[in-house]
C-alpha cells in the first residue's frame, strides 16, 4: 500500500482497515492500482479483531481455564490450592493475542 503523504493521486482510496477494507486494498494493489488505505484506529482488522469478538473470546478462554481449575481438575484427581485471577495479566494476554493477529494482517 502506498504512502498517503505523497502528492501523487491514488487510483483507489479505501476507507477502513476492517476485513473488507484491507482485502479490497490488497486486491487493488495486486491489480496494479496505486492504493491508499485509511484507518483511523491505528491497527488493521476492524472492530471484531481489535475491540470486539477476538478480545472477548480471549477473555472467555481465560475464564474457561479458571472454571476447569475450579471444577474439572478435581474430577481427574488434580487438587489445586486456592485459585486466584490476575486480571491485569489476563488483559495483557488478551492484548498479546490481538497484537499477534493485527501484526499478521499488516504483513499481508
Where are these regions (language model features)?
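Short glycine/serine/threonine-rich phosphate/pyrophosphate-binding segments
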Residues: 20-24
Amino acid at each position: 500500500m502506498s504512502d498517503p503523504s505523497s502528492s501523487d493521486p491514488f487510483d483507489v482510496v479505501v476507507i477502513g482497515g476492517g476485513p473488507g477494507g484491507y482485502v479490497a486494498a490488497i486486491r487493488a494493489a495486486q491489480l496494479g492500482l496505486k492504493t491508499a488505505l485509511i484507518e483511523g484506529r491505528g491497527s488493521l482488522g476492524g472492530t471484531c479483531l481489535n475491540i470486539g469478538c477476538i478480545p472477548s473470546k480471549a477473555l472467555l478462554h481465560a475464564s474457561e481455564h479458571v472454571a476447569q481449575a475450579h471444577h474439572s481438575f478435581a474430577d481427574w484427581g488434580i487438587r489445586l490450592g486456592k485459585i486466584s485471577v490476575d486480571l491485569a495479566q489476563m488483559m495483557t494476554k488478551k492484548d498479546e493475542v490481538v497484537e499477534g493477529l493485527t501484526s499478521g494482517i499488516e504483513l499481508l
